[in-house]
């Protein structure tokens, strides 16, 4: 592939920021409901672990028998006896399902459109949430978590892709970071509901709530148009012009001109009868094996994998259990506070990401995470609760300002527009593999090494900071592939 000068997604003037329209806000919010589902389900097993697995009994009302509750009356067990390894498998198989969903999501999105693939993912999320709610065995929980992982794996590809395609370049960083904000909102929602439902009678309602979010997302998509970039790439030019006109503050003629600029930048002017395969981008296998994709592929692999290998999901998956060893009476409350902090700092990052840039935030984020991982290790090893909680809060804040929002945002910015869906799938698959490895191995490593396991995360974060400094280009405000990769 010749690295010719082509416009990146939403290329345009960088002089002033255009106004944000109501349809742009609506489209971003609806797309982000998919990320909220991802965040919700990735953390839903954190708080109720001991109650679900029969390790702890806590009745919300001593005067009411479990058999008198709705779930008890309908034959649902009070708990499902699980070993730590079985619970680890249920937690981590979410990542395997997510890997499958992400693997196919790019091709599905290219073929059927961003909107309808996202709606299908939400439908699967609704069904799998209900399956988890009604589960009475280890195998049922495994199957439900695999399915919900598939749906979330699809959603986490579509959300940043759709936002990147509808946002003006001047707002790309701020709006793209809403993906991570939404993931954190999903995690916060789980922790909020856990304050009420994390007990021996009500833990199933935490699993049921995911279906409510899924139904809301399906209905909300009915109010949003398909991505204009997908429409124009498949020959639906008039529909693309109408959709873009709603997203932009200017006139219909200006929207039409932007569509024509897109077509010229890609060297085609398609009609509806054209083969949709011609400009659908590479397959995932082509992307992985073709040497012409080596530069963006390598950086995407490093960023999306190290986001997990720096240890964030050791807190998201197992934070209640880890902190509970030192603060058993306050572990759920501490995790709730962590979730609030994650949302607040990510929102703050979204306000500065287009001013500061991607590289400085990634460097600051990983450097602080390195130091805090070491302090978490010390706090756990020496049972110093104040040090553990403080270091954990700073660690989460550091993640939220850089390594949280930037990886999924930067994939599209590092890629040609026609490669973006496949690159998004590739990066997300890498992220899922890393998530599975951390989710499965962390409880084993923590059992063998105790707090010293966080020293491993510190070493990885330090190496990744060095890699960012040497290999990751800045993408802030850049509109062409060659401009992004100049000097690399």
From Swiss-Prot:
GO BP annotations listed: monosaccharide transmembrane transport; transmembrane transport
Gene Ontology molecular function terms on file: hexose transmembrane transporter activity; transmembrane transporter activity
Record keyword Transmembrane helix present: yes
Membrane topology according to the record: Multi-pass membrane protein
InterPro entries hit by this protein: GLUT, MFS_dom, MFS_sugar_transport-like, MFS_trans_sf, Sugar/inositol_transpt, Sugar_transporter_CS
Gene3D superfamilies noted in UniProt: MFS general substrate transporter like domains
Cellular compartments annotated: Vacuole membrane
Compositional bias ranges of the Basic and acidic residues kind: 258-279
Alphabetized Pfam families for the sequence: Sugar_tr (PF00083)
Sequence ranges on the Cytoplasmic membrane side: 1-18, 109-121, 168-178, 226-299, 338-344, 412-419, 464-488
Region annotated Disordered, chain positions: 258-281
GO cellular component entries: fungal-type vacuole membrane; membrane
Vacuolar side: 40-87, 143-146, 199-204, 321-322, 365-390, 443-446
Claim: Ribosomal protein is one of the keywords in the record: no
Keyword line: Glycoprotein, Membrane, Repeat, Transmembrane, Transmembrane helix, Transport, Vacuole
CDD domains on file: MFS_GLUT_Class1_2_like
NCBIfam families, A to Z: SP
This protein's name: Probable metabolite transport protein YBR241C
Organism: Saccharomyces cerevisiae (strain ATCC 204508 / S288c) (Baker's yeast)
């Amino acid at each position: 592939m010749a690295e010719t000068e082509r416009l990146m997604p939403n290329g345009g003037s960088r002089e002033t920021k255009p106004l944000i329209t109501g349809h742009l806000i609506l489209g971003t919010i609806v797309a982000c409901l998919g990320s909220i589902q991802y965040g919700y389900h990735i953390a839903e097993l954190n708080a109720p672990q001991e109650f679900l697995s029969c390790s702890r009994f806590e009745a919300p009302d001593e005067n009411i028998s479990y058999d008198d509750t709705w779930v008890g009356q309908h034959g649902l067990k009070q708990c499902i006896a699980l070993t730590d390894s079985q619970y680890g498998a249920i937690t981590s198989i979410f990542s395997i399902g997510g890997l499958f969903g992400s693997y196919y999501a790019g091709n599905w999105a290219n073929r059927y459109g961003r909107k309808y693939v996202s709606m299908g993912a939400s439908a699967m999320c609704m069904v799998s949430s209900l399956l988890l709610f009604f589960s009475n065995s280890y195998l049922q929980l495994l199957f439900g978590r695999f399915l919900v992982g598939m749906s979330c794996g699809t959603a986490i590809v579509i959300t940043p892709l759709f936002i990147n395609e509808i946002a003006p370049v001047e707002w790309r960083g701020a709006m793209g970071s809403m993906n991570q904000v939404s993931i954190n909102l999903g995690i916060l929602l789980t922790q909020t509901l856990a304050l009420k439902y994390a007990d021996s009678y009500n833990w199933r309602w935490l699993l049921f709530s995911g279906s409510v979010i899924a139904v809301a997302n399906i209905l909300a998509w009915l109010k949003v148009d398909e991505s204009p970039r997908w429409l124009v790439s498949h020959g639906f030019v008039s529909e693309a012009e109408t959709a873009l006109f709603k997203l932009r503050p200017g006139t219909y003629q200006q929207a039409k001109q932007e569509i024509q600029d897109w077509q010229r930048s890609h060297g085609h002017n398609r009609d509806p009868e054209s083969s949709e395969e011609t400009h659908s981008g590479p397959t995932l296998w082509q992307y992985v094996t073709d040497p012409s994709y080596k530069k963006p592929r390598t950086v995407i692999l490093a960023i999306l994998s190290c986001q997990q290998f720096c240890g964030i999901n050791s807190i998201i998956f197992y934070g209640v259990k880890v902190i509970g060893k030192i603060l058993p009476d306050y572990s759920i409350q501490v995790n709730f506070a962590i979730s609030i902090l994650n949302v607040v700092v990510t929102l703050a990052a979204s306000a500065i990401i287009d001013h500061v840039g991607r590289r400085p935030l990634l460097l600051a984020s990983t450097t602080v995470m390195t130091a805090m991982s070491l302090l978490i290790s010390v706090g756990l090893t020496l049972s110093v609760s104040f040090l553990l909680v403080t270091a954990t809060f700073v660690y989460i804040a550091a993640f939220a300002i850089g390594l949280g929002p930037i990886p999924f945002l930067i994939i599209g910015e590092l890629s040609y527009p026609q490669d973006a869906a496949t690159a998004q799938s590739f990066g997300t698959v890498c992220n899922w593999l890393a998530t599975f490895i951390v989710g499965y191995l962390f409880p084993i490593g923590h059992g063998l090494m105790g707090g010293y396991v966080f020293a491993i995360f510190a070493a990885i974060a330090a190496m990744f900071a060095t890699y960012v400094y040497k290999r990751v280009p800045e993408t802030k405000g850049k509109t062409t592939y060659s401009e992004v990769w100049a000097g690399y």
